[in-house]
Design a protein with these regions (language model features):
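Conserved phosphate/pyrophosphate-binding and hydrolysis machinery centered on Walker-type P-loop NTPases
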Residues: 1, 18-25, 167, 336
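Conserved S-adenosyl-L-methionine
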Residues: 18-131, 135-149, 171, 191-194, ...
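Generic structural signal for individual residues within well-ordered alpha-helical segments
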Residues: 1, 29-30, 343
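General structural signal for alpha-helix termini and helix-helix connectors
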Residues: 13, 17, 330-331
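Long recognition/docking surfaces used for binding and targeting
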Residues: 1-12
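A conserved structural/catalytic subdomain of Rossmann-like adenosyl-cofactor enzymes
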Residues: 120-365
Length: 365
């Protein structure tokens, strides 16, 4: 099973525009699982499960728990994991990956659906959602026009349970993930920067998320860790809550693992050890015991800082795109990264800009 995982990662490297978009860095997945700490006998879902990375990490975490009884072991093998993957080849890779790691049965009913998770609420609710929905801002579908040529049409999902109707794929996944959770469910989701700052539907979704869930943590990720180039992403951690008038979120803790952090896929890839400080700050076993590492005078370089709900609501468009650390790369000319690292970072930033312009062009078209 581990050899197969290694081959999937190698394939992701070789096909950046192909399998790479379905492959989340395994150290990041492991850190997310360590923070969420899923419990035996609970269900775990991923509405865009790719090759099954989140399932495998959660399985390893749960299988390592001491004294699992026979029922819990059977539940872990056959009933814990539920996913969707619309790309047929990727779904097959996922099913094989899971079977090789002793999840499910070859002749059993698959818990990985080939259906588009966003089309409708199927009514099922889960204890945990761990996900990295596909990058690419717009949802679209291809069709053949009258002249026999192929066109794409912007796709919006008109769902009564969504707070906002939008063609932004990530905002739709975020709304869907919230709807998948049990009242006590927890989510950890990788999402691009636009989800944090986009106006219109983006602001509506952020406000509703702050009101109806406890959005307690945002991990800002560096560039250079994903196979899809130019991706600037974050992990949002939130707990679902029962309905009430007052907002459930009182403060959001932000860990900036982007400013002055340099990773590349080959020379300096992200390692699990790199996220140890974040996990320690997250304080998985008792979040109420968290302490800021940032201090205005004593430690202005601290990466861990909290913002009250009022501070966030007062920001333009309720933006969660928050930074406070100074970018040293411009000031510290003595300690610039290696030329090839610098070149790769420049390419990442240009790619990110180009991707934004492509989305604008699509919108104008």
């Amino acid at each position: 099973g581990d050899i197969y995982e290694g081959l999937l990662e190698k394939n992701a490297e070789d096909t950046k525009s192909g399998a790479g978009q379905y492959f989340t860095p395994r150290p990041l997945i492991r850190a997310m699982v360590e923070c969420v700490q899923p419990q035996p006998g609970k269900t775990i879902a991923d509405p865009a499960c790719g090759t099954g990375g989140f399932f495998l990490a959660a399985y390893d975490y749960l299988a390592a728990q001491p004294a699992l009884d026979k029922e819990q072991k059977a539940f872990l093998k056959n009933s814990t994991f539920h996913g969707n993957e619309i790309v047929a080849g990727t779904r097959r890779l996922c099913l094989m990956n899971m079977l090789l790691h002793n999840i499910g049965e070859i002749d059993g009913q698959s818990t990985i659906s080939p259906n588009d998770a966003l089309i409708a609420d199927d009514g099922r609710r889960f204890d945990y959602v761990l996900a990295n929905p596909p990058f690419g801002k717009k949802s679209s579908m291809s069709f053949t026009n009258a002249e026999g040529g192929e066109e794409t049409d912007e796709l919006t999902y008109n769902r009564q349970d969504f707070w906002a109707t939008t063609s932004n794929k990530q905002l739709n996944f975020l709304q869907h993930i919230r709807s998948m959770l049990r009242t006590t469910g927890q989510a950890a989701v990788v999402l691009p920067d636009n989800v944090l700052f986009e106006g219109g539907a983006g602001e509506t979704v952020r406000r509703k998320l702050l009101e109806t869930t406890e959005l307690h943590t945002v991990l800002r990720l560096p560039t250079g860790i994903f196979y899809a180039q130019g991706v600037k992403a974050n992990v949002l951690f939130f707990d679902n809550k029962p309905a009430r008038k007052e907002p459930w979120t009182r403060e959001v803790w932000i860990y900036d693992y982007r400013t002055n952090i340099h990773h590349t896929l080959k020379k300096k890839p992200l390692r699990f050890e790199d996220l140890q400080d974040f996990i320690a700050c997250y304080h998985p076993s008792s979040r109420h015991a968290r302490k800021e590492t940032w201090h205005e005078t004593d430690n202005p370089e601290g990466r861990w800082r909290k913002y009250g709900l009022e501070q966030i609501l007062a920001r333009d468009k309720t933006s969660l795109d928050i930074f406070w650390l100074k970018d040293k790369s411009l000031a510290d000319l003595e300690n610039l990264p290696e030329p090839d690292d610098l070149a790769e970072e420049i390419i990442e930033n240009i790619e990110a800009g180009l991707n934004s312009f492509r989305e604008i062009l699509k919108g104008l078209g």
